């Protein structure tokens, strides 16, 4: 996989040729469980019950990876229509929703940054100025990861870009594959690649959540408000991830004698700014400027992203061509559209009301104030993510429930939606994110390392969130 191809990947695990016993069991359950629900004597309207049967197929397929994620979603949407649960325009409504198109446009912008060389130049420039000691290089990797999130929305793409730099640095340090130096760099660039796109409205998961919040919460989700809501947490995460890695994996050596020379050499190889890089910088700069100021002009983030993405395809103005469009992996876009469609079907069949009542019944007595609401939603979402490995399916199936609960109980849908989405960033196992799977596949750290770092950062971010929600968010109008 190359950096050019990376943005097309999004956060979906690659399909495997040899199915695990777990996946085989999932394929069996995908048939038996929906049939059992379809013909069960549940006290529900037929349309609601049949919708749940197909929903069970989709969720089981996503949990067990019985088939490729997007294929499972396509089958589910088709069954909603073919079996008469809802009409075609509802079963496939997600494909006309702005959420999927936002992701498509974000992937185009990421492709602009990577194919033009802009992302790599930015990475080398930052690394050149942070210093040549291991602690400074590690901090530079984390800061670069965060800044790249603005121009390369795909966490997978950022991991691929930074991994190529980290491998060269590992060689420069003459560090072995299992050394603390190599382990620390790859572990933290992988994990932060997974969480930064929850703090910025950039990755597929955050985009899916924002679309569901708009649809089911009836609210306007602004890119700038999202950025500033999590900006303090972003800063804390950068520093906490840096110090945590140095503490858990102290380097065998501190300095890199030719660190500055290495980055200067790489920048020299790239030469002066090319026309493509200049165009890419202008296009991405326009997108970021419009996103950050959307609280003023109220141009939807999707409109900005799609406008810039299409401009990048225009002759003479853009930097992408027909071949770039052909290389783009559209499966993540389809997957998001299918997750949105599923939520719309739940609403149309009244299944959303049933699920909200069941899911929130046992936690409702404890949701008494802003502190308990924040804590319970955070940890419930964290645990729920163990069941639905994909962030898109996790957020696509749960955000509608959170929005419905917020509206029926007089709570702020934006506040609850941001808390729930942010909690999706906390992970312990590679299977929970395609980004983690790709980082883990390089072989520089082990599964237990991911658990250690993930557990610490999940707790740290929870503490920060408990301070932001009641004290900082009201300053932004999020009460």
Predicted regions mapped to residue ranges:
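Juxtamembrane and boundary regions of transmembrane helices in multi-pass small-molecule transporters
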Residues: 2-35, 155-158, 174-183, 187-209, ...
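Membrane-embedded alpha-helical segments and adjacent helix-loop junctions characteristic
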Residues: 15-19, 57, 70-71, 75-176, ...
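Structural signature of hydrophobic alpha-helical transmembrane segments
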Residues: 44-53, 97-108, 158, 299-309, ...
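Lipid-exposed faces of alpha-helical membrane segments in multi-pass integral membrane proteins
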Residues: 29-36, 53-60, 75, 79, ...
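Transmembrane alpha-helix interface/packing and boundary motifs in multi-pass membrane proteins
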Residues: 60-68, 144-154, 190-201, 290-296, ...
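Interfacial loop-to-helix junctions that mark the boundaries of transmembrane helices
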Residues: 16-22, 42-50, 61-62, 66, ...
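Flexible hinge motifs at transmembrane-helix junctions and intramembrane kinks/re-entrant loops
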Residues: 42-52, 56-74, 91, 239, ...
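Hydrophobic alpha-helical transmembrane segments in multi-pass integral membrane proteins
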Residues: 200, 289-290, 339-357, 414, ...
């Amino acid at each position: 996989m190359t950096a050019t191809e990376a943005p097309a990947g999004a956060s979906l695990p690659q399909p495997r040729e040899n199915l695990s016993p777990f996946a085989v069991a999932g394929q069996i359950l995908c048939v038996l469980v929906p049939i059992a629900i379809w013909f069960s004597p549940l006290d529900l309207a037929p349309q609601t019950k049949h919708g749940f049967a197909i929903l069970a197929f989709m969720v089981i397929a996503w949990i067990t990876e019985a088939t490729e994620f997007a294929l499972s979603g396509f089958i589910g949407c088709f069954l909603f229509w073919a079996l008469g649960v809802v009409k075609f325009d509802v079963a496939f409504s997600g494909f006309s929703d702005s959420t999927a198109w936002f992701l498509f446009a974000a992937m185009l912008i990421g492709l602009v940054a990577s194919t033009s060389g802009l992302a790599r130049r930015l990475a080398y420039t930052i690394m050149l100025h942070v210093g040549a000691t291991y602690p400074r290089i590690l901090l530079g990797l984390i800061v670069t990861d965060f800044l790249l999130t603005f121009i390369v929305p795909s966490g997978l793409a950022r991991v691929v870009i930074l991994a190529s730099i980290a491998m060269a640095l590992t060689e420069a340090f003459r560090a072995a594959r299992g050394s603390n130096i190599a382990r620390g760099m790859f572990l933290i660039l992988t994990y932060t690649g997974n969480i930064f796109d929850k703090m910025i409205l950039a990755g597929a998961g955050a985009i899916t959540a924002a679309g569901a919040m708009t649809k089911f919460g009836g609210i306007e989700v602004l890119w700038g408000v999202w950025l500033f809501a999590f900006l303090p947490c972003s800063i804390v995460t950068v520093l906490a991830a840096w110090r945590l890695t140095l503490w858990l994996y102290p380097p065998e050596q501190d300095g890199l004698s030719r660190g500055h020379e290495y980055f200067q050499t790489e920048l020299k190889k790239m030469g002066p700014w090319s026309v493509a890089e200049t165009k890419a910088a202008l296009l991405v700069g326009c997108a970021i400027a419009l996103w950050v100021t959307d609280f003023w002009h109220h141009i939807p983030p999707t409109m900005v992203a799609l406008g810039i993405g299409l401009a990048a395809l225009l002759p003479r103005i853009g930097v992408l061509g027909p071949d770039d469009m052909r290389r783009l992996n559209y499966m993540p876009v389809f997957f998001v559209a299918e997750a949105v469609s599923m939520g719309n079907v739940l609403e149309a069949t009244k299944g959303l009301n049933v699920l909200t009542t069941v899911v929130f019944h046992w936690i409702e007595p404890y949701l008494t104030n802003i502190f308990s609401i924040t804590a319970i939603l955070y940890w419930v979402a964290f645990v729920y993510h163990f069941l639905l490995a994909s962030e898109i399916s996790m957020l696509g199936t749960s955000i509608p429930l959170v929005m419905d609960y917020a509206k029926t109980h007089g709570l702020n849908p934006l506040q609850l939606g941001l808390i729930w989405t942010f909690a999706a960033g906390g992970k312990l196992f590679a299977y929970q994110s395609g980004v983690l799977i790709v980082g883990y596949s390089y072989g520089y750290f082990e599964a237990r390392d991911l658990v250690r770092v993930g557990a610490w950062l999940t707790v740290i971010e929870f503490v920060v969130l408990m301070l932001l929600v009641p004290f900082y968010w009201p300053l932004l109008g999020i009460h």
